[in-house]
A protein has these predicted regions:
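Acidic helix/loop microenvironments that form the catalytic cleft of cell-wall polysaccharide enzymes
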Residues: 240, 244, 557, 617
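Primarily a LysM-type cell-wall glycan-binding module
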Residues: 523-547, 571, 579-607, 611-614, ...
Length: 637
C-alpha cells in the first residue's frame, strides 16, 4: 500500500488502487506474505446517539464557526519545555499511535479541501453513518503487523536491513550492539513517489515517523523470537497478540487513564460501548476526539540515540523523525534507514535521568518555530498549504465539527461525571491567546469534545492522565476492542502473561522490547519440547518443581493441546514462570449428561454460578447450552 502522511485521509479510489498494487507486488515478489483474512470496511457511529437529538449538545452551526475553530487550533501551539513533561515515558506516545493504526483507518470524512472550506458545514447524520468507513478490523489483533503486504520468511516475519554508513564517531556512528536487521521491509526504488522505498507493512502509517517505525520493527522481532523457540506462525502470532492486549489494558491504559475506570470496565464489563453489537461500528467520539490525546503528548524533539539527542548531540526533532523514515527525498542514495538512526530505546522508556517523557495531556501542542505538528508535510516534503492544512490541531477541531461530535459538557452530563464550568475551562488553558479564542467562539460553555478532553485532563490530574470523560471514552472502546478480538485475553479470565517480565504477573511495553532484543538483554520465553513418554505432570515436576502445576501448562497451551492426556513428541509447549503467580487452576472433564448449571451446583455449590464457568471457557464453549463429553473446563477458584 502506498505511504500515508500523518493526518491524511485515504480515499476509496486510493484503496482500490492499493489493493491492486498489493496483488501485483505479491505476484512478483519471492517472499511469502503473512496471511490474514480480507478486511471488510465497517461504519462509524455515535457512542452517544441520543445527544444528536438536541442541537444544544453540539457546537452551534454558524457561518463563522470554521474560522473560530481555526483560531482556537492555532492558539494551541506551545514551545517544547521539559518542565511541562508528564511522568509517562515518551515511548507510550508512539505505542498509542501504533494502537490507533491497529484499529482505525478512516475514509470518507472529507478531503482537506472540504475541511478547510470557509463555508464548511456539518454533514447530516445519515451521511456520516453511510460514508465514513473504517478499513481496519476494529480489534486488537495486530492486523497492522500481520496484514498484507507484510512479507514472511517461513514462519518468521521478514525484517529489513539498515544502510551502513561505516562511521566510528557521532553523528554517523551506529549505536552499539545494533545489528543490520533494524528497518522495515521495503519496496525497491520507484519513480512513483507513493511507492519509492515504501514500507511493506499491514498499515503504511507505521512508517510515518522513526519511533513508530522502530516500534513496528520490535513487534516483528518479538514474533520472530517466539518462532525461534519452536512455535509455529499461528502460535507465535497468538502469543504476541495476547501479550499486546495485556500491555494495552494493564500498562498503556493504566498510565493514560484513571485506573479505577479501567479496572471497573475490566471487571464489570462495558457500560456504554457494546463490542459484540452487530453490525459493528467504531465510535466517532472515540476516534475523532477522545483517542486524539496523543497529539498533545508529542514532543518537538527527543533523546533518540547517541547521535541525535538533547545532551550535546543533534536534537532528534519531529521534523527529522518524519523525514528519515518517510524516505521522501532527503536520503540521497540510501535504500533503507541509515544505521545512525537506529533507536536506543532506553532513551524513551524507563526511569533513567535522560529518558524523554511525553508532554502533559493538556490544551497545548508542541511547536518549535511554528513546526512539529503545526508543519505537516506532503509526500514531496513540502509544507501543506494553506497554512491551516499544516496545523494538526486545526484539522482535529474542524473534523469534529464536520462530524457533529457532541460538546464535552454534553458528554460529561450524560455520563454523570462532573461537568467543567466556564471558569474551569478557562483556568485549564495556559495562554491569554487561547483564552481569547475560547471566549470568541463561546467554546468555554460549548467546548469541542477533543479540546474538552484535554482541558479535563489538566483540570483533574494536572495533565498526568485523562479525566473522567476522556478515561471513559478511551477505556470503554479499547477494552471493548480487546473483548471482540479473536484471541481475547478478556474472554479467558484465567489468562496471565507468561513471557519474561521485570515484574512477575504482568507484562509491560519495556518487557516486550526486551523480549524482542531491542532494549537491554532480553530473555527468551520458557519453552519445552515434548519427548517420548512425557506427561504434563512429569513436565511440571521437572520444569516447575511441582507436578501439581500441570494445569498451568495445559491452559497456556490449550490452543494446541486438545486433551491433556495426549501430548506428542516434538510439540513445543510454553511454560509458565518458575515461581507461581497465582493459585493452580481447577479443571473439570465434562461427562455425559452434564450441564453448566449441574457442574456449578456440584463443584461450586450453586447452580446459578454457571455463567462464571462459561466466562472462563469462552475459547472452547461458544454456546452455554452445548458442552461436549470429554471437554476440559476451567473452574473458578
Amino acid at each position: 500500500m502506498p505511504r500515508l502522511m500523518h493526518g491524511r485521509i485515504v480515499t476509496e479510489e486510493e484503496l482500490k488502487r492499493a489493493a491492486g498494487d498489493v496483488a501485483e507486488f505479491s505476484a512478483r515478489s519471492p517472499a511469502r506474505f503473512a496471511f490474514t483474512p480480507p478486511v471488510d470496511s465497517h461504519s462509524f457511529d455515535y457512542l452517544f446517539p441520543s445527544l444528536q437529538d438536541d442541537e444544544a449538545n453540539l457546537l452551534p452551526e454558524a457561518a463563522n464557526m470554521p474560522d473560530l475553530l481555526k483560531k482556537l487550533g492555532a492558539s494551541m501551539a506551545q514551545a517544547d519545555v521539559p518542565a511541562g513533561d508528564s511522568a509517562i515515558p515518551a515511548a507510550y506516545t508512539y505505542l498509542g499511535q501504533f494502537i490507533d493504526h491497529d484499529i482505525t483507518l478512516e475514509t470518507g470524512s472529507g478531503a482537506l479541501t472540504d475541511l478547510l472550506d470557509p463555508g464548511m458545514t456539518p454533514l447530516p447524520v445519515a451521511e456520516i453513518r453511510h460514508v465514513v468507513r473504517n478499513l481496519r478490523t476494529g480489534a486488537l489483533d495486530l492486523d497492522s503487523v500481520y496484514g498484507p503486504p507484510a512479507p514472511r520468511d517461513g514462519a518468521k516475519m521478514l525484517i529489513g536491513n539498515v544502510s551502513s554508513l561505516g562511521g566510528t564517531q557521532p553523528p554517523i556512528k551506529r549505536p552499539p550492539g545494533k545489528s543490520d536487521d533494524n528497518d522495515l521491509p521495503r519496496e525497491p526504488r520507484s519513480a512513483d513517489i507513493e511507492h519509492d522505498r515504501a514500507a511493506l507493512t499491514g498499515d503504511p502509517r507505521n512508517d510515518e515517523n522513526l519511533i513508530i517505525s522502530q516500534l513496528h520493527v520490535a513487534f516483528l522481532k518479538a514474533h520472530n523470537a517466539l518462532v525461534g523457540q519452536g512455535l509455529s506462525f499461528g502460535e507465535a502470532s497468538r502469543v504476541l497478540r495476547q501479550h499486546y492486549q495485556h500491555i494495552v489494558v494493564h500498562d498503556f491504559l493504566k498510565r493514560i487513564a484513571e485506573p479505577a475506570i479501567v479496572d471497573d470496565i475490566v471487571t464489570s464489563g462495558n457500560h456504554w460501548f457494546d463490542p459484540a453489537a452487530y453490525p459493528f461500528r467504531m465510535p466517532l467520539e472515540f476516534s475523532f476526539a477522545g483517542y486524539r490525546l496523543g497529539h498533545t503528548m508529542v514532543r518537538a524533539a527527543y533523546n533518540f540515540n547517541l547521535n541525535f539527542n538533547l545532551h550535546g548531540g543533534i536534537p532528534a526533532t519531529l521534523e527529522l523523525l518524519f523525514t528519515f523514515t518517510a524516505l521522501s527525498g532527503d536520503l540521497n542514495d540510501f535504500d533503507t534507514i541509515p544505521d545512525n538512526w537506529i533507536i536506543e530505546w532506553e532513551n524513551v522508556i524507563g526511569t533513567g535521568p535522560n529518558v524523554s517523557h511525553a508532554r502533559k495531556l493538556d490544551t497545548n501542542i508542541a511547536s518549535v518555530n511554528d513546526k512539529a505538528l503545526y508543519n505537516l508535510h506532503t509526500l514531496t516534503g513540502a509544507t501543506e498549504a494553506p497554512v491551516d492544512a499544516a496545523r494538526l490541531p486545526v484539522r482535529n477541531l474542524l473534523r469534529g465539527y464536520r462530524l457533529r461530535l457532541p460538546t464535552g459538557q454534553a458528554v460529561a452530563h450524560l455520563l454523570g461525571v462532573p461537568v467543567l464550568s466556564k471558569d474551569e475551562i478557562l483556568a485549564a488553558v495556559n495562554s491569554p491567546a487561547q483564552a481569547a479564542a475560547l471566549q470568541a467562539g463561546g467554546f468555554e460553555s460549548r467546548t469541542p469534545l477533543w479540546f474538552y478532553v484535554l482541558a479535563e485532563a489538566n483540570h483533574f490530574h494536572q495533565g498526568e492522565r485523562l479525566g473522567p470523560v476522556g478515561s471513559t471514552l478511551v477505556a470503554e472502546v479499547l477494552i471493548g476492542l480487546v473483548r471482540r478480538s479473536e484471541d481475547s485475553i478478556l474472554r479467558l479470565p484465567a489468562w496471565k502473561p507468561y513471557l519474561p517480565s521485570a515484574k512477575a504477573g504482568t507484562f509491560e511495553l519495556a518487557d516486550l522490547l526486551r523480549f524482542a532484543g531491542v532494549l537491554g538483554s532480553g530473555q527468551p520465553p520458557r519453552t519445552y519440547t515434548v519427548k517420548k513418554g512425557d506427561t504434563l505432570t512429569a513436565i511440571a515436576r521437572s520444569q516447575l518443581g511441582d507436578g501439581n502445576r500441570w494445569p498451568e501448562i495445559y491452559l497456556m497451551n490449550r490452543g494446541t493441546i486438545r486433551n491433556p492426556n495426549q501430548i506428542f513428541p516434538g510439540q513445543v509447549l510454553l511454560l509458565p514462570p518458575a515461581q507461581p503467580t497465582g493459585p493452580i487452576p481447577k479443571l473439570y472433564t465434562v461427562k455425559k449428561g452434564d450441564t453448566l448449571s449441574g457442574i456449578a451446583k456440584a463443584k461450586l455449590g450453586n447452580a446459578n454460578r454457571w455463567p462464571e464457568i462459561f466466562a472462563l471457557n469462552r475459547d472452547v464453549i461458544t454456546n452455554p447450552d452445548r458442552i461436549i463429553t470429554g471437554q476440559i473446563l476451567v473452574l473458578p477458584n
